[in-house]
């Protein structure tokens, strides 16, 4: 699939994809994923063609941008590494996020409180989000999926070949997808200028690490305050001592 020149993969984006290990696939390869294989390493890990990944990502972005109401797009991730990325994608593009467990019947049972009638579904992993894909097939909703080389492709209309197990890879794909959607909608008019949002915002962060970092920062601030108080006390004592000596000299 040949893309217009404006959609070509830039060296900066290629470096991001490689740095996030998006090109590292699985050891096993499904038949439908064979066209996306670039090579195989000696340890058995298959390398994904980053050019194919970019082509499918742009195709998915064009499909998303063609839907008039952004809320009709549902972004799903039951995988932990993709939940933050899905929420950020929805915040930037206006899509409807489902982060966490997908409630069965959300697309088929209109009695449930979580019932939705989307026009497009995007999932992070066809295995983890199999229930959502299955229900989408029942009601003829097209599905875009982030697929690894060993991921099943049944009922998936557009597969974006990538490493859908790494937290950096998942976050970067959602980031690039959101950026391309905004560019196609006209929100980001200048393609030569980078997006003000950094990819790190889409990466998964461990809550325990965040709490530990917050505690360390609080301890550091407390230590700095104690040091300032000690310095202030020493300065006060020195000033009092100097005043006493001055009084004695005058006497």
Curated annotation (Swiss-Prot):
<dbReference type="InterPro" id="IPR023591">
    <property type="entry name" value="Ribosomal_uS2_flav_dom_sf"/>
</dbReference>
<dbReference type="GO" id="GO:0003735">
    <property type="term" value="F:structural constituent of ribosome"/>
</dbReference>
<comment type="similarity">
    <text>Belongs to the universal ribosomal protein uS2 family.</text>
</comment>
<dbReference type="GO" id="GO:0022627">
    <property type="term" value="C:cytosolic small ribosomal subunit"/>
</dbReference>
<feature type="region of interest" description="Disordered">
    <location>
        <begin position="209"/>
        <end position="251"/>
    </location>
</feature>
<keyword id="KW-0963">Cytoplasm</keyword>
<keyword id="KW-0689">Ribosomal protein</keyword>
<keyword id="KW-0007">Acetylation</keyword>
<dbReference type="GO" id="GO:0006412">
    <property type="term" value="P:translation"/>
</dbReference>
<feature type="modified residue" description="N-acetylserine">
    <location>
        <position position="2"/>
    </location>
</feature>
<dbReference type="InterPro" id="IPR027498">
    <property type="entry name" value="Ribosomal_uS2_euk"/>
</dbReference>
<comment type="function">
    <text>Required for the assembly and/or stability of the 40S ribosomal subunit. Required for the processing of the 20S rRNA-precursor to mature 18S rRNA in a late step of the maturation of 40S ribosomal subunits.</text>
</comment>
<dbReference type="Pfam" id="PF00318">
    <property type="entry name" value="Ribosomal_S2"/>
</dbReference>
<dbReference type="InterPro" id="IPR001865">
    <property type="entry name" value="Ribosomal_uS2"/>
</dbReference>
<feature type="compositionally biased region" description="Acidic residues">
    <location>
        <begin position="218"/>
        <end position="237"/>
    </location>
</feature>
<feature type="compositionally biased region" description="Low complexity">
    <location>
        <begin position="238"/>
        <end position="251"/>
    </location>
</feature>
<dbReference type="InterPro" id="IPR018130">
    <property type="entry name" value="Ribosomal_uS2_CS"/>
</dbReference>
<keyword id="KW-0687">Ribonucleoprotein</keyword>
<dbReference type="GO" id="GO:0000028">
    <property type="term" value="P:ribosomal small subunit assembly"/>
</dbReference>
<protein>
    <recommendedName>
        <fullName>Small ribosomal subunit protein uS2</fullName>
    </recommendedName>
</protein>
<comment type="subunit">
    <text>Component of the small ribosomal subunit. Mature ribosomes consist of a small (40S) and a large (60S) subunit. The 40S subunit contains about 33 different proteins and 1 molecule of RNA (18S). The 60S subunit contains about 49 different proteins and 3 molecules of RNA (25S, 5.8S and 5S). Interacts with RPS21.</text>
</comment>
<dbReference type="InterPro" id="IPR005707">
    <property type="entry name" value="Ribosomal_uS2_euk/arc"/>
</dbReference>
């Amino acid at each position: 699939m040949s893309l217009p020149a404006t959609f070509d993969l830039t060296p900066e984006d290629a470096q991001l994809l490689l740095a996030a290990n998006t090109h590292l696939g699985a050891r096993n390869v499904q038949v439908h994923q064979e066209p996306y294989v670039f090579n195989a390493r000696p340890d058995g890990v298959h390398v994904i063609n980053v050019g194919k990944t970019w082509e499918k990502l742009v195709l998915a972005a064009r499909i998303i941008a063609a839907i008039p109401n952004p809320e009709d797009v549902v972004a799903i991730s039951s995988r932990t590494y993709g939940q933050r990325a899905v929420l950020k994608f929805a915040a930037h593009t206006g899509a409807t996020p489902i982060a966490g467990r997908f409630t069965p019947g959300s697309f088929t049972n209109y009695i449930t409180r979580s019932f939705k009638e989307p026009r497009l579904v995007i999932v992070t992993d066809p295995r983890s989000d199999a229930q959502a894909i299955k229900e989408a097939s029942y009601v003829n909703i097209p599905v875009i999926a982030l697929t690894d080389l060993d991921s099943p492709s049944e009922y998936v209309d557009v597969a974006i070949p990538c490493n859908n197990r790494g937290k950096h890879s998942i976050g970067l794909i959602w980031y690039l997808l959101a950026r391309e959607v905004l560019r196609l909608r006209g929100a980001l008019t200048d393609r030569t200028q980078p997006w003000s949002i950094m990819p790190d915002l889409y990466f998964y962060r461990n809550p325990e690490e965040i709490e530990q970092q917050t505690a360390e920062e609080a301890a550091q601030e407390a230590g700095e305050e104690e040091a300032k108080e000690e310095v202030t006390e020493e300065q006060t004592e020195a000033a009092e001592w100097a005043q006493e000596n001055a009084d004695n000299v005058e006497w």
